[in-house]
Amino acid sequence: MKTETDFFDQATIVVRAGNGGNGAATFRREKYVPRGGPNGGDGGRGGHVYLIADPEYNTLLHFRYQRKFVAENGGHGGKNAMHGRNGTDVYVPVPPGTVVRATIDGVTYSVDLARPGQRLLAARGGRGGLGNIHFATSTRQAPRLAELGEPGQELTLELELKMLADVGLVGFPNAGKSTLLSVISAARPKIAAYPFTTLTPNLGIVEVGLQRFVVADIPGLIEGAHAGVGLGHDFLRHVERTRLLIHIIDAAGVDGRYPWDDYEQINTELRLYQPELAQRKQVVALNKADLPAAQENLPILRERLPVAPEDLFVISAATGEGIEPLLRRVADLLRADPPPQRDPVDPDEPPLQWPLPEVDENAFTIEREGEAFRVRGIKIERLIAMSNLDQDEALDRIQRVLEASGINEALIAAGVQDGDLVRIGRAELVWDDSGQHAL
């Protein structure tokens, strides 16, 4: 069945994973056991947010109506060492061919979801907090210490769909691309005699005998498109994944340009945008052959264009002249160069993750922040986030970690003075010279 597709190819969404559940501080109620003994269970993990390449989708239109996706928080731990329930994961469908970008710690990362079923762990759920059962020692037999759940990750994602069309129609505005697409498929693009009538790609399914392929009408390119002139970047990126190009030229020169110059300029823009595009297989369609000016130009075009005769076609999208042999040639070329196999992903295949560099979680930095000192580090900031700062046992634990990790020593070397503020995550501690630590 021939179809028309509305196109929506860029979107910005926010994904927020669930927070981990809090650990419990509970005690057994048994005779002869001090305070009953700790038996608080751990909190559950917060739900993850995944993006999944779903072949049922072919645009990003659904993100026009929903832009924020939030996973469930983990359940809190309970008595009798009961573990909290893990939060339910959220799966956000995107069309295959979607490139996902996120900026994490000032660095932008991208992941390509090209294969059906491919998943990206976009936002990781927070760890569940440990219950007090983990903090019992020979000297602390009834600890009231339990961790809070770790906050879930929240990211803003930029989505860009690079279409998976087989054939791209390229050419100057008003060369006749939209008219041709409307003739060879059931697509109904907007058609009018002024530049940039087509501002988004239109897709059409073309049938040649038993063969079917997808054709994309790439919005008209102009000189300077590779540098973004005339929305050039928005247009050119859709050419990247096509297997073959039909280069349509207004052979009549209706807009006052020389048709042979149009050919050179479009190929120059393709080459400057991405050198590989200049090597992409092309067939050239000299359109508007029903006009007298085109008939006058055809001998010159055949002589000047560096195109093999079998790849040069004289057509009229308005009358249908020459279209059938053009499509047969396109079908033959596609059949001779099948697309790379994109088998669906095995459901057991692990999800893709952001390609973050390996880091030492124990590492930390100290910098001045006005009159205060700011300590940054993955492990120490996670500890702060998962600590109840109103609880004495939690503060004692933080102090032990600051001392054991070398942070206190580094603060002294950085010039911390009695009464100075020391900020770590959400915590503001006051340095105490007498004890050589922050409180």
Curated annotation (Swiss-Prot):
Keywords: Cytoplasm, GTP-binding, Hydrolase, Magnesium, Metal-binding, Nucleotide-binding. Its main location: cytoplasm. Mg(2+) binds at S178, T198. Its EC number is 3.6.5.-. One of its GO terms (molecular function) is GTPase activity. Residues 356-433 form the OCT domain. One of its GO terms (cellular component) is cytoplasm. Residues 5-164 form the Obg domain. It comes from the Bacteria. SUPFAM superfamilies: Obg GTP-binding protein C-terminal domain, Obg GTP-binding protein N-terminal domain, P-loop containing nucleoside triphosphate hydrolases. Residues 165-335 form the OBG-type G domain. GTP binds at residues 171-178, 196-200, 217-220, 287-290, 316-318. It is found in: Cytoplasm. Its cofactor is Mg(2+). GO terms for biological process: ribosome biogenesis. It is an enzyme of class 3 (hydrolase). The keyword GTP-binding applies. NCBIfam families: Obg_CgtA, Obg_CgtA_exten, PRK12296.1, PRK12297.1, PRK12299.1. An essential GTPase which binds GTP, GDP and possibly (p)ppGpp with moderate affinity, with high nucleotide exchange rates and a fairly low GTP hydrolysis rate. Plays a role in control of the cell cycle, stress response, ribosome biogenesis and in those bacteria that undergo differentiation, in morphogenesis control. Belongs to the TRAFAC class OBG-HflX-like GTPase superfamily. OBG GTPase family. Monomer. This is GTPase Obg. It comes from Chloroflexus aurantiacus (strain ATCC 29366 / DSM 635 / J-10-fl).
